[in-house]
Design a protein with these regions (language model features):
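Extracytoplasmic metal-acquisition and chelation regions
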Residues: 4-300
Length: 300
């Protein structure tokens, strides 16, 4: 990759100079990039953030993350405010090439924290758009296309391989989308309650109605008023299912379920996972698990 060396990257050997190191900001970017660079020699993909509890907005860079970043030629991020944890350090890597996967994609206005009452105290992330783009299969396909196009531009010697791999992966995602539409388009009960603002793009794509969201943060709990409001919505709309996420505690959901008789299910927005060779199909696998969960939860 000509002219794409990070000024903070050490050149220890000829071998290291010949290897293109791509770093992804978090797991969904890692899965997409892994598929795009599949079987291309001298191109490695490293994921920076580790599996965690809570929202990526609250992530703090570790010493290991900074070392990984210092060895990167290209950094692939979701963008749309998702990687705010990079804001204070990214200027130190002036020659690092950054690919923003969500660039040019139509985004949904962020309603996160809007319904929070004054007594629910935590830091406002102050984002104008919802960053959870990849949770929509269609928009994830757009992100894959964007990544492949930018990689092809930055590393033209492998452009054909990037595009070929991207097209193969996109075909799999298109099949997944068709499978999910064939089931979810015919579900009668489409009102859902979620416990984080991760699913607006998914809901928009598959015609689900998010009638209530209760925010869960690692260092705080929703206010009593927020919980009461959600309980009122559940009773008013006869909601039978509450959807939590695997990276958050289900404590509040358990309380609401006891009050309303609703059942608790888990939907995975695929924010975290193990960054290894088994990750290639993890997006598809977890989306199929989400489909099975929705079929079970909304069949009444």
């Amino acid at each position: 990759l000509t002219g794409c060396n990070n000024s903070a990257k050490s050149n220890n050997s000829t071998e290291s100079n010949n290897k293109l190191t791509i770093v992804t900001s978090f797991y969904p970017m890692y899965i997409s990039t892994l598929n795009i660079v599949k079987d291309i020699p001298n191109v490695e993909v490293l994921n920076m953030t580790t599996p965690q509890t809570g929202c990526l907005h609250d992530y703090s860079l570790s010493t290991k993350d900074l070392k990984t970043l210092s060895n990167a030629d290209i950094l692939i991020i979701n963008g749309a405010g998702m990687e705010s944890f990079l804001d204070d350090v990214i200027d130190e890597y002036s020659d690092l090439k950054i690919i923003e996967a969500s660039k040019g994609i139509d985004l949904i206005e962020d309603t996160e924290h809007d319904d929070h009452t004054e007594d629910h105290d935590h830091e406002d992330h102050d984002h104008d758009v919802n960053p959870h783009v990849w949770v929509s299969i269609s928009k994830n396909i757009e992100e894959v296309s964007n990544i492949a196009e930018e990689l092809s531009s930055l590393d033209p010697n492998h452009a054909n391989e990037y595009q070929y791999n991207a097209n193969e992966y996109i075909a799999k995602l298109e099949n997944l989308k068709t499978e999910m539409h064939s089931t979810l388009d015919n579900i009668a009960h489409k009102d859902i309650i979620t416990f984080h603002e991760a699913f607006p793009y998914f809901a928009e794509e598959f015609g689900l109605n998010i009638v209530g969201v209760i925010e869960i943060e690692p260092d705080s709990e929703p206010s009593a008023k927020e919980v009461e409001n959600i309980i009122s919505i559940i009773n008013e709309k006869n909601i039978k299912a509450l959807f939590t996420e695997p990276q958050y505690s289900s404590k509040i959901a358990d309380t609401i379920a006891k009050e309303t008789g609703a059942s608790i299910y888990t939907l995975d927005p695929i924010v975290t996972g193990d960054s290894n060779e088994k990750a290639y199909n993890d997006y598809i696998i977890k989306m199929q698990e989400n489909l099975n969960t929705l079929k079970e939860a909304l069949k009444w």
